[in-house]
Amino acid sequence: MLTQKTKDIVKATAPVLAQHGYAIIQHFYKRMFQAHPELKNIFNMAHQERGEQQQALARAVYAYAANIENPESLSAVLKDIAHKHASLGVRPEQYPIVGEHLLASIKEVLGDAATDEIISAWAQAYGNLADILAGMESELYERSEERAGGWAGWRRFIVREKNPESDVITSFVLEPADGGPVADFEPGQYTSVAVQVPKLGYQQIRQYSLSDSPNGRSYRISVKREDGGLGTPGYVSSLLHDEINVGDELKLAAPYGNFYIDVSATTPIVLISGGVGLTPMVSMLKKALQTPPRKVVFVHGARNSAVHAMRDRLKEASRTYPDFKLFIFYDEPLPTDIEGRDYDFAGLVDVEKVKDSILLDDADYYICGPVPFMRMQHDKLLGLGITEARIHYEVFGPDLFAE
């Protein structure tokens, strides 16, 4: 339990840390990786190079400090972090390592301004946060291991199918190498895939949505190729596209994530996606259309038909289920793409153009796609009168969505 004095010191110094936050976090990662290079196996090094992980951690530290009197207000954020950590295999013994280098970085960047009293207060605050997260993650590991077909840590899977979905998205159907069943998951959850990157000399982990409904035998992930070279974003996705084939092995974590629909509800849902953001939506859609039927509206944006994954199966579903409406936006339609046949609207996704179809009583709204896309859709939904509590979103990688 933190004393009031500790809370007061943390709150009073939070603005100073926010001002120097990026420099502190940059210093922290450099310091920690020099002392513990094995942690590069957990962290996304592409996000490191772009500075996104540094920004996200700096923002998280400040948010925790600013809300230290009312940590319950961060419960949803902490839950998301715990799910992400569980998917990465973060262990309790790694928290002291992070704490040691974070506190040392605060001292080394701020110098004499970071007094012993300030460092002590932040050490207590960090310890409290670490205990909360480690406890949440322990529960997630136990739950994953105890359920039928579940496991904790990494499990070897065999690629049984590799199917191109578009020019840039490929689906992989994966079955356990041990021949056992796989755990069910909530529609919208993700798994982590761990691959060894020989040229880097360490493992890299990426999260991919499970893009099919649970079947107890296999998982399907749909991966967008993010073109890039060594050490840049997209290296892992390119490796999966180019080097992983049927019969090869991949290591998977159990399903995690808080972005999913309530399968017991019958109220309407509106799915809004951009690009590869449709992958969790497809899983949600398949489950929602099962008995009892519920109203579903799917609004999707892509550049054109060449990169529009799973187009035919979505169109088929819209013809089959009377309670399902599909709206497609192409912002760069090909000459062969015909409005009214291949897509409904030219341009970027604009929910105002379909507001008569998406403004439904008691509906929940799910957004997935690039961060700027999600921010735009989120703000437009608020402008249409949708409450914040009804809007849900998924961010893979550092969460740069919330300001």
Swiss-Prot record:
**Which region ranges are annotated with the description Reductase?**
149-403
Q: Where does NADP(+) bind?
A: G275, V276, G277, L278, T279, P280
Active site located where? Y95 (charge relay system), E137 (charge relay system)
EC number(s) recorded for this UniProt protein: 1.14.12.17
Q: What class of enzyme is it?
A: oxidoreductase
Q: Which residues form the FAD-binding FR-type domain?
A: 152-262
Kindly state what the record says about how the cofactor is bound: Binds 1 heme b (iron(II)-protoporphyrin IX) group per subunit. Binds 1 FAD per subunit.
Could you give the domain comment from the record? Consists of two distinct domains; an N-terminal heme-containing oxygen-binding domain and a C-terminal reductase domain with binding sites for FAD and NAD(P)H.
Residues binding heme b: H85
Q: What is the protein name for this chain? A: Flavohemoprotein
Positions of the record's site feature: Influences the redox potential of the prosthetic heme and FAD groups: K84, E394
- Which NCBIfam families does this entry report, sorted A to Z? PRK13289.1
Q: Domain Globin: where?
A: 1-138
What cofactor does this protein call for?
heme b; FAD
Q: Which domain of life is it from?
A: Bacteria
For this entry, list what GO says about its biological process.
cellular response to nitrosative stress; nitric oxide catabolic process; response to toxic substance
Q: Which InterPro entries match?
A: Cbr1-like_FAD-bd_dom, FAD-bd_FR_type, Flavoprot_Pyr_Nucl_cyt_Rdtase, FNR_nucleotide-bd, Globin, Globin-like_sf, Globin/Proto, Hmp
| Positions that bind FAD | Y190, R206, Q207, Y208, S209, V395, F396, G397, P398
Functional note: Is involved in NO detoxification in an aerobic process, termed nitric oxide dioxygenase (NOD) reaction that utilizes O(2) and NAD(P)H to convert NO to nitrate, which protects the bacterium from various noxious nitrogen compounds. Therefore, plays a central role in the inducible response to nitrosative stress.
Enumerate the UniProt keywords alphabetically.
Answer: Detoxification, FAD, Flavoprotein, Heme, Iron, Metal-binding, NAD, NADP, Oxidoreductase, Oxygen transport, Plasmid, Transport
Q: What chemistry does it catalyse, as a reaction equation?
A: 2 nitric oxide + NADPH + 2 O2 = 2 nitrate + NADP(+) + H(+); 2 nitric oxide + NADH + 2 O2 = 2 nitrate + NAD(+) + H(+)
Task: Return the annotated site residues (Involved in heme-bound ligand stabilization and O-O bond activation).
Answer: Y29
Gene Ontology molecular functions: FAD binding; heme binding; metal ion binding; nitric oxide dioxygenase NAD(P)H activity; oxygen binding; oxygen carrier activity
